[in-house]
């Protein structure tokens, strides 16, 4: 049986505002927007948890090859590059719903029509079954 998991997350920040760097310590860290997105997204992911009361999520797809479908639904008419939003989504899912983003073989990102004031993204993760080459 192929496992599918669908859920919504807050609209992710652009990768341009997701990270900040410290020239003094030469390190890269999550920006305030990045941390806020992670916190809100993890609250939503905890609701998906089988345990419900657990403080941690265990990957639902520990070793499977994955297909990820992302629908970006903006809350206003401002333009944005869809590829700048994917990194934040995959980062928050990695370690919580799958072990590593190297498991992803197919990634589809679609811009949906604006839903005024209700920016969000829909994510569907599907297991890819091995196909025989007969």
Where are these regions (language model features)?
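Acidic, proline/glycine-enriched N-terminal capping motif
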Residues: 1-134
